[in-house]
């Protein structure tokens, strides 16, 4: 795919939706699945990242969970990169209607994008399960060892979805509705067989444009790669 061809497609789009994978965030160091990171976590905590980011572990060992959440997620949140700012420019031009992502580092919103649907939550919307009050990442970082709600004293729930918890059905429905209304689907940093990329099945528009650093057999389903 030539840059010029992609540019012409995006310029003609009026209702672009982006499926934003973890590729760009991983390049910023925001990746819980790197082998070296997983090894380091297991050495320090005696558990893998996937075992810690689990509802049972959170409920049984909240102090350890929040140590990991602060040191290994919030302190590794990175900064928006050129991908995020390109999406912001598309939004400013009135072409990009929204972003759907499984990432929870909130990079696109921090770049200035407004309609970002986080399927697995995000680190700046930690919440009190009792009264619903919202707390950002800075609050969690500054309240050790356990962040409690200022209003009712309840332990704050992390803003990210934990393994063993149900995803929010309303959020999923919003994402499906957004994708199904798009005329161009821009898939970035993932392939069409991933959990996020497979949501392209709800797309009924004109073009699927795929931007990824690695090839995948599912690429042939895209109109431009």
What does each of the following model-derived ranges do?
Residues 1-225:
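Conserved catalytic core of sirtuin-type NAD+-dependent deacylases
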């Amino acid at each position: 795919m030539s840059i010029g061809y992609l540019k012409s497609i995006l310029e003609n789009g009026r209702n672009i939706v982006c499926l934003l994978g973890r590729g760009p965030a991983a390049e910023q160091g925001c990746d819980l699945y790197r082998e070296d990171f997983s090894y380091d976590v297991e050495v320090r905590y005696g558990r893998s990242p996937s075992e810690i980011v689990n509802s049972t572990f959170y409920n049984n060992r909240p102090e350890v969970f929040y140590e990991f959440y602060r040191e290994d997620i919030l302190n590794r949140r990175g900064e928006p990169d050129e991908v995020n700012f390109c999406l912001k420019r598309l939004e400013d031009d009135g072409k990009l209607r929204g972003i759907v992502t499984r990432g929870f580092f909130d990079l696109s919103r921090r770049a200035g994008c407004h309609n970002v649907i986080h399927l697995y939550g995000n680190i700046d919307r930690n919440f009190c399960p009792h009264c619903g009050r919202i707390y950002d990442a800075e609050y969690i970082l500054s309240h050790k060892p356990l962040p409690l709600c200022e209003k009712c004293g309840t332990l704050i729930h992390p803003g990210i979805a934990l393994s063993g918890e149900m995803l929010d059905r309303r959020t999923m429905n919003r994402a499906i509705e957004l994708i199904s209304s798009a005329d161009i689907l821009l898939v970035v940093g993932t392939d069409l067989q991933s959990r996020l990329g497979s949501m392209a099945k709800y797309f009924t528009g004109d073009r699927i444009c795929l931007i990824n650093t690695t090839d995948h057999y599912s690429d042939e389903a895209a109109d431009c790669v």
